[in-house]
């Protein structure tokens, strides 16, 4: 299998970390949807990161579906078994994904010429990001987000979203405002599986 996309994408990185934790072997190729469009188009004409090329050449787009395929292949999931814990994990995973989505949206807005930026929209996505980070920080403070020993999807999503915020949009994510989330994410980043997939790998 081949996972395609840059690790500074929270979606690519979450898929890579999850696949590794599930014990799967796959190749990774750092191809940018911005700097290497022609190369990416040759792999997936949708130019969507991450993309997974399966062993039979099928291309799967969208990180959630790639993770679902990883679970199918491994015959297991990182999600908890107990119903109430599983539901909480789903909720927190969604919040982590929203945090990543809004941080990505902020970065995309900054790529626009200043005259084409819409201040009310920028304010909205920043507010959404901060709400998501507030919720994740509170969950980390309650011990609902951890760094293992058994990582859940919500732990991974939260840590990777925070890492992306600090790497790409640090001015919108000061550590002192969300210290519990920062501590949880820092503990995750110290794990071998996170070190295997560093956000700054070219």
Regions found by a protein language model. Give the residues of each.
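Long hydrophobic alpha-helical segments typical of transmembrane helices together
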Residues: 175-202
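Non-transmembrane alpha-helical segments in soluble domains
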Residues: 67, 71, 90-93, 133, ...
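Aromatic-glycine hotspot motif
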Residues: 52, 64, 129-137, 193
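GST-like domain detector, emphasizing the conserved glutathione-binding G-site
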Residues: 1-119
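Class I S-adenosyl-L-methionine
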Residues: 16, 20, 137, 166, ...
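Short, contiguous strand/loop micro-motifs
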Residues: 2-3, 171-172, 196
């Amino acid at each position: 299998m081949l996972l395609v996309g840059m690790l500074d994408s929270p979606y690519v990185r979450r898929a890579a970390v999850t696949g590794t934790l599930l014990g799967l072997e796959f190749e990774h190729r750092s191809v940018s949807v911005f700097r290497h469009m022609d190369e990416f188009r040759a792999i997936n004409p949708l130019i969507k990161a991450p993309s997974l090329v399966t062993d039979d050449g099928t291309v799967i787009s969208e990180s959630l579906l790639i993770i679902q395929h990883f679970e199918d292949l491994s015959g297991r999931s990182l999600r908890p078994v107990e119903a109430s814990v599983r539901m909480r994990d789903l909720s927190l995973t969604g919040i982590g994904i929203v945090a990543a989505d809004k941080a990505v949206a902020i970065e995309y807005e900054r790529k626009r010429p200043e005259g084409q930026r819409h201040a009310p929209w920028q304010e909205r996505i920043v507010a959404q990001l901060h709400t998501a980070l507030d919720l994740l920080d509170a969950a980390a403070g309650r011990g609902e987000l951890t760094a293992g020993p058994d990582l859940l999807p919500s732990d991974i999503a939260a840590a990777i979203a925070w890492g992306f915020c600090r790497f790409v949009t640090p001015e919108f994510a000061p550590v002192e405002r969300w210290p519990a989330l920062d501590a949880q994410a820092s503990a995750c980043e110290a794990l071998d599986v996170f070190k295997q997939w560093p956000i700054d790998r070219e």
